[in-house]
Amino acid sequence: MDIQHGPYQQVRRPIRNRMRNLDELKLRQIADGGDHKPPSSELVTEFESAFDIVLPTDYIALLMYSNGGYPELDSVIPIGMNESGRLSINRFYRLDENRCDTEGLWRVMKVWKPILGHGLLPVASDGGGNQFVLDLRANACGVYFCIHDEKFILQHVADSFGKLIDSLHINPDFI
């Protein structure tokens, strides 16, 4: 699916390999009275246009499945790290009409785009305010962990959003 954005044309990145069944993540929502239904294709397009990005299909699959949430399988070991470098996802952000929701992509992008720059999209956070970020810049891809206490350095976590999902597991410290 070709999408025209800005002065250049981008192509939606396909799912390279089928990622795991999203039921396995055991995503749950907080009973906050919010509407957690999947975003419409029009809303996805509006969000992409507002930030001049193209969301990868594997990330859209998560939005359509649960539109964010808190995963039970929340632990990931970044590329090149060992068990001691394990990271945990507290929540995936949702995409809905509410532009002020602190768990929503609109607000998260408003806060983080000036820090991260164009083409980097926070999709999840840990419990301490650090962000799991999709790199959507041209000729780039992957998921990074933005460590705000260390001058916002980006640590490579996975080569794609699907690979991040595939690598999530239950933190053995909580079993």
Can you describe what each PLM-predicted range is?
Residues 137-140, 161-163:
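A short, sequence-level motif marking secondary-structure junctions
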Residues 5-128, 172-175:
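A surface-exposed partner-binding patch
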Residues 147-152:
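Short, solvent-exposed aromatic-acidic interface loops
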Residues 153-173:
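Compact, glycine/acidic-enriched structural inserts
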Residues 130-136:
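Short, surface-exposed beta-strand/loop micro-motifs that present aromatic residues
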